[in-house]
């Protein structure tokens, strides 16, 4: 086996998604996700995600590294702690995080996700 480099600049058709109705708090956010890589164990994923403005509840069953390319987002945990990120920001949302994700301006990010399979 000769593993190849995964180039995120290669065109890839994204999948349109949106938050579940019971998770939505504000707006009508529309997401596009393009998953460029899944490892053989199906526990590690990497790709590109974009969203229009809106706010929804989140409960992370995975750990996610995010690198925001464009736009502004705000994450808030259940205790009320708040983090705002703009272009160029990198951050990790750890497994078990609960709170809200708000897109203030249309945004795009690269993501790398690890989710343990049982």
Task: Give short role names for the model-derived ranges.
Residues 95-118:
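Ligand-binding loop in jelly-roll beta-barrel domains
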Residues 39-60, 94-95, 117:
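Conserved short histidine dyad/triad with adjacent acidic residue
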Residues 60-75:
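Short, conserved beta-strand element in jelly-roll/cupin
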Residues 35, 65, 90, 100:
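Short, surface-exposed charged micro-motifs
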Residues 79-95:
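Short acidic-glycine-tyrosine-enriched beta hairpin
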Residues 35-36, 46-48, 56-60, 77, ...:
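Short histidine-centered beta-strand/loop micro-motifs
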Residues 58, 75, 109-111:
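Short hydrophobic/aromatic-rich beta-strand segments that constitute the beta-sheet cores
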Residues 1-43:
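A short, N-terminal "cap"/entry segment at the start of jelly-roll beta-barrel domains
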């Amino acid at each position: 086996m000769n593993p190849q480099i995964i180039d995120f600049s290669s065109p890839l058709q994204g999948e349109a998604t949106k938050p579940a109705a019971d998770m939505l708090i504000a707006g009508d956010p529309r997401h596009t996700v393009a998953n460029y890589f899944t490892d053989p164990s199906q526990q590690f994923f990497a790709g590109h995600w974009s969203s229009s403005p809106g706010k929804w509840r989140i409960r992370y069953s995975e750990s996610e590294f995010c690198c925001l390319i464009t736009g502004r987002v705000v994450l808030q945990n259940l205790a009320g702690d708040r983090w705002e990120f703009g272009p160029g920001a990198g951050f990790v949302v750890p497994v078990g995080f609960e709170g809200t994700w708000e897109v203030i301006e249309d945004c795009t990010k690269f993501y790398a996700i690890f989710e343990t399979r049982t």
